[in-house]
Amino acid sequence: MKNALINATTKKFEIIEKTVLPITWGLYWHNKFETWKYDAYDEKNVFCFGSGVLPVIGGHRLIFSFRSPLWDGFYFSSMGGAGYQFKSTGLNNVAIIGRCENPSILVIENDGQLRIDFIEVKEELKTVYEVSKYILELYKDKNLRSVVVGEAAKRTNMGGLFSQTVRNGKFVEGSEDWAARGGGGSVLYRAHNIMGIVFFGDEKEDKEEKEKAKKIIESYYKKPMSKVVLEHTKKYRYDEETKTGGTFGNNWLLYKEKVPIFNWRMPYIDKEDRKKILEKILKFYLEIFNKETIEPKRWANCGEPCPVLCKKYRNKNKVDYEPYASNGTLLGIFDLYEADRVVKTADALGFDAIEIGNLTAWVFELLDVGLLKEEELNIKKPIFDYKKITNDDDEEIREISKHNAEQAIKFMHNLAENSNDLYKILSLGKRKAAKILNERFKSRVNKIGKKFNDFAVYVPFGDWGEIAPNLYWTPGFFMPFVIQGRYLTYYKPEFNEPEKLAELVVESIKLELPIENLGICRFHRKWLKPVLKELVKELLGIEDIVEDSINLYREICEYNKKIGYPAKIESERVKDLIIAMAKEFGNEEWTKKFENKENVDEYVKRVLNKYSELLGIDWRIS
């Protein structure tokens, strides 16, 4: 494998010949540069990325790793399809150190000879679409792919990385993806002064290796590979049983009345009322989505030739469950057209949709309960009364959704611009902001009897680290593991005994981390699981990819322990979510135990004890 270490200060690069997977590559450099010693925005926070290494359908993701300004530890995030173009450069992995003097675009090209250059950007580019278009105009005749940041990366900890497929000199509608979790876009811009990366070349994929992989898969399944893929990915393409497709189509039906609403207030809303709200979601979200997306087959892939076509789009909006739950139902928005506006704003500004949705929902509730004031944020209070959704007519629901959407859009613009001192604090994230605001508004805290963090939903790490959970009401996303906000957990709608949950989480890690490190789309995990070890052994020479991945997880743990340790759950809302889950899923023993709220600590402690034992790490709460 050919890899490059690029210095953005000197504009020089070094080629390193080494067989190494993308996340392993990133952690290697973070240990080498001892990045735990420095601020997340120090130029020593090496920004790494690499492409998928197995020549299989779904195997061309681009994986980014960095020390996260949010989580505070080592973090990784990935996007679909971009690795398909990146392989044409002849490189497998890249690491960036140093800092450009002025905002720049990194150019990686290979037309027979590898060239790496930087282009200074003098124009005022604010949205991810403007940066992407700027790059496209420069290299329209190339078979390119770009990865860019937006305004959010410049002044907040929540900047993501955006990429859209280009074909014949034009952007492909719906074929776009994000590596947004953890604030990688913020690191790329604020640590290295890089607004975007563009790559293109003429290196070809090894056809012999591709045939070898296909033979292994078809030998196991005794059927054509294309059929294997489609049979195991119907949720993401089209499910005949549900008559819909994609995460947006199916997750509302799967999680039903447990979908997150109103800043995760589900524990305080009667189940029957939540069912009524679900009816509104199915009417104003799912029915419209099916009519405008599923029926006319507005489906695309991420940019690699994949038949699943998981990207569902309508009205120039790519529609996925988590961005729309975060920036729709979580904000009290139940009109899909209004949610479109909010998601498009979050995307244009370059925010991690999950993180900004959770932050906005928190701020909405702070306004609703009086811990923050309208005049301090220059937005109006949201309409955050769930009974108005269960009781009101359709037109009233549209008006409520429009009002909340307008406040969310204003809030996001103000946050991206850091329009006043309060927005500067909020741009740090919920946990850091809550610590500051608890002191600043002590009298309000005393009056209400609750702290700012009591309304915030996040997983803590160390003294300052945090990440917003994925949009699933399930214990696995609230546990303070070595890394959170990824799918290295167990998230089916269940409530298990702590030791059982730990066992399920570790089993998930054994599948999810290998496919992340190999750069494979997790939508292909079902068909891939039985053949993964053989594929990796035959094509990469790695004897046991699962054991290799567990060792990697242990190394991430050791890195993160240099920064902090698992923290107890600090938020009353998160504790209430865990307590309510025990009741929701009929666990009488824990429902009784949770009558004493402090027993949430016991549950978490037991999960981490078993998790540590199974993984051979020390990640316990004392």
Curated annotation (Swiss-Prot):
A Pfam short name: AFOR_C
Cofactor section: [4Fe-4S] cluster
Keywords: 4Fe-4S, Iron, Iron-sulfur, Metal-binding
InterPro entries reported for this sequence: Ald_Fedxn_OxRdtase_dom2, Ald_Fedxn_OxRdtase_N, Ald_Fedxn_OxRdtase_N_sf, OxRdtase_Ald_Fedxn_C, Tungsten_al_ferr_oxy-like_C, W-dependent_AOR
Originating species: Methanocaldococcus jannaschii (strain ATCC 43067 / DSM 2661 / JAL-1 / JCM 10045 / NBRC 100440) (Methanococcus jannaschii)
Lineage: Archaea, Methanobacteriati, Methanobacteriota, Methanomada group, Methanococci
Chain residues that bind [4Fe-4S] cluster: C302, C306, C310, C521
Co-factor binding details: Binds 1 [4Fe-4S] cluster per subunit.
Protein name in the entry: Uncharacterized protein MJ1185
PANTHER family xrefs: ALDEHYDE FERREDOXIN OXIDOREDUCTASE, TUNGSTEN-CONTAINING GLYCERALDEHYDE-3-PHOSPHATE:FERREDOXIN OXIDOREDUCTASE
Keyword Disulfide bond attached: no
Record-stated family: Belongs to the AOR/FOR family.
Gene Ontology MF term list: 4 iron, 4 sulfur cluster binding; electron transfer activity; metal ion binding; oxidoreductase activity, acting on the aldehyde or oxo group of donors, iron-sulfur protein as acceptor
SMART domains on file: AFOR_N
